[in-house]
Amino acid sequence: MAKSQNKESPELRTPNRFITDHDASGLSVFNTSIPDALPAQVIGGRDRFHLAYATTTSPVDLTNQSDIVTYSSFLSTPPGIFLPGGSVLRIVDVRPGGESLMHRTESIDYGVVLDGEIDLVLDSGESRILKRGDVAVQRGTNHLWRNRSHTAWGRMVFVTLEAKPIEIDGKLLGGVTGLGMDDTSPAGN
């Protein structure tokens, strides 16, 4: 099978997503109702989001392809960073030297670096360097992501889940705007 490349970042191939399913007899098969290649959503004219999957309930209803129908609807109108009561699986391509704005969402985000080195910077000034295979558990904190390379794209995969509002010393923190992604909202659609 030929390697499918992104025109804007030839070092990163276009990611594929393979969905398993059941045939009429209950045998495990691959679902072919949605193309495998993940389309890219350009964010703020810069970085790219690839929506790999999304659900709107927990537990997820897998009967009669309910979850696949839900996900399919999000391909034309991508969700926000997280979906209330559901989950979002997203691959994020960060341009060379790219940096998000400082932001907070009412979510828990599991992020794994797939390519490159990415800084996770907190509003306290603390930061960590994430290398390929490293995991960040982002728990509703005010943070930004930065690609350390000025010549190569970075890639991360995220699973985001809604979280309860954070309360510190009797004060609700809430979500913070300033995602730096004009075409993406923190929650929902």
Curated annotation (Swiss-Prot):
Keywords, ordered alphabetically: Virulence
Superkingdom of this protein's organism: Eukaryota
InterPro entries: Cupin_2 (IPR013096), OryJ/VirC-like (IPR047142), RmlC-like_jellyroll (IPR014710), RmlC_Cupin_sf (IPR011051)
Function per UniProt: Part of the gene cluster that mediates the biosynthesis of the phomopsins, a group of hexapeptide mycotoxins which infects lupins and causes lupinosis disease in livestock. The role of phomC within the phomopsins biosynthesis pathway has still to be determined. The pathway starts with the processing of the precursor phomA by several endopeptidases including kexin proteases as well as the cluster-specific S41 family peptidase phomP1 and the oligopeptidase phomG to produce 10 identical copies of the hexapeptide Tyr-Val-Ile-Pro-Ile-Asp.
Family: Belongs to the oryJ family.
The protein's name in its UniProt record: Phomopsin biosynthesis cluster protein D
Species lineage: Eukaryota, Fungi, Dikarya, Ascomycota, Pezizomycotina
